[in-house]
């Protein structure tokens, strides 16, 4: 919960916030193994009403965390969706109780490879069990019950967060009123899997990999940095890279690259290794690649059980999760007569568009939530 007055850095900020951790006895994974105990890092913004029917769960993407809005003490930058979460914003904390949690398998406070194995007293690292998108959602469901919430007003997310939102609609059809899926898909294509495989192989090829049992003093940093560089290319569009970098020379005294785009990617890779774990990168990308609700008739059958309204947003410039994948979701929902609104935004920023400030996107989210909050259609 916020612990101070709103920060002036961003108008409408929820202010200074703290990440909390909820601990549960255990979670049985879809593969049959058990996480004991289960820890979930989370943050909340706003106030849960007496009926407990105003809660919105926001789900993060691959490298995200529970810190979606506001500022941690001493930070200069706010949470990853601060533009959209806060008083008077699209996810209005004057109306809604926003919950954001770190996925299990990650490395930002929830159970994952960095967690301590009770049998050895050491971090699990690569011995941590495989975690699926379904497992991530089942862990979130425990957190929702922890708050005494039976039905969420909405579940929202982009990219991997969109997959979690989709999984919520299928696994717990009576537990959410609205589902917002942005820049996502019902399953990864061969190309999407290929991008992730290159990143994983970069990590596995690092001399410090040591079968995933590396020390913090000798981590596979070069491999993880290369994985992040590869991934970051897919998050941007050709137009954005052309406009931002073109063929400009690198800034500063950088000898290892001849171009500005190269120095940018090197910076992204090097800064990433300071805030993310290589094992978690492998676990989370595998969860992404193994997620599948199917396509075509198979997807239509799976989505026949959903009971909520949908907002699906795609981006013309997103070549990592191209609009046709969102359209497949929409078509399957329409066959099942599920209320769905589909919008393709011509945002030049590529896949990262769902994360970036946009007045148009803010208006779309705001209008959808307001319409359904009032019992109408968007």
From Swiss-Prot:
Name the Pfam families on file: Abhydrolase_1
Principal EC category: transferase
**Entries under InterPro entries matching the protein:** AB_hydrolase_1 (IPR000073), AB_hydrolase_fold (IPR029058), HAT_MetX-like (IPR008220)
Q: Which reaction does it catalyse?
A: L-homoserine + acetyl-CoA = O-acetyl-L-homoserine + CoA
An example of a Gene Ontology BP annotation on this entry?
methionine biosynthetic process
Q: What is its main location?
A: cytoplasm
Location in or out of the cell: Cytoplasm
Q: In which pathway does it act?
A: Amino-acid biosynthesis; L-methionine biosynthesis via de novo pathway; O-acetyl-L-homoserine from L-homoserine: step 1/1
Q: Which NCBIfam families match?
A: homoserO_Ac_trn (TIGR01392), PRK00175.1 (NF001209)
HAMAP family per UniProt? MetX_acyltransf (MF_00296)
| Binding partners and assembly | Homodimer.
Kindly provide the name given to this protein in its UniProt entry: Homoserine O-acetyltransferase
Which organism is this entry from? Leptospira biflexa serovar Patoc (strain Patoc 1 / ATCC 23582 / Paris)
